[in-house]
Amino acid sequence: MHPFRFGVVVNTAASGADWIARARRAEAIGYATFLVTDHLGRQLSPLTALMAAATATTTLRVGSYVFANDYRHPLVLAREAATIDFLSGGRLELGLGAGWMTVDYRRLGMPYDPPAKRIDRLAEALPLISRLLSGETVDHEGPAYRLGGAEVHPRPVQRPRPPIMVGGGGPRMLRLAARYADIVAIQPQFSPKGRARLREATDGAMARKVAILREAAGESFERLELNVIVADAGLAGSGRPVGTSLLAAGKSVATHLVGTPFALYGTVGQLSDALERRRDRFGISYYALPSRALDEMAPLVEALAGR
């Protein structure tokens, strides 16, 4: 059983100083990771932002949540990841996914291939990135990628390599994660326009996803750290309306998520009990909280982190 960890997903800031202050605040509260997503809208560029957060802190881990595989060649991404891990003293978590938001592909002028093709490319890229970060010299000729004598320098500090997170919600993505990941971000599936499919964000759906992971990983299941993204979170008595961000994602059915792993509302005691039960049932121990809840959820982080 993994101890509880909490990350905070932060994509924007009012200024450079504000970005640094947020990273330092997260570290002071006890968040384990400072996470940045990978979209082409109004957010900071993840690689540069993660390095800035790492430079401003001493123990806070930084991570991509998650890099879209199609946007970068595996060697280019492995080099960037190795450099961040080296310069941060070994604090990178490398999150990867197949890419899913149509507007990002349109902005890049890239074809938005069917999921099977995007997952094919990720399945080819994952072992290449893992081998490169582990210090191997890689020669490869495949359907999507070719590498000849490829290496990354300097080597990452973490050995054999920085932990890899794979994010996804469909059966094939979960099986891929079971094979290559150290951390699995179990996500509700999204429509190409970015709306969560809420039928995939229930406790019943979570049980099915974990069962797929368990079957695919076999004896290695216990080594996997299971993560979920929290769409909205709040402590009882905070005065903030419940489900405002969920309503943006799912309209009138948003309240159905209250009480699932994807929405955390209640007192510290209630939430502590709920997270303990979910860890016992599903194995979920790592929660990625939204930036707006960074300070509000501090009492929960302080109560559970490391337990």
Q: Where are the regions a protein language model picked out?
A:
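Active-site-adjacent structural elements that line small-molecule/cofactor binding pockets in enzymes
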Residues: 1-307
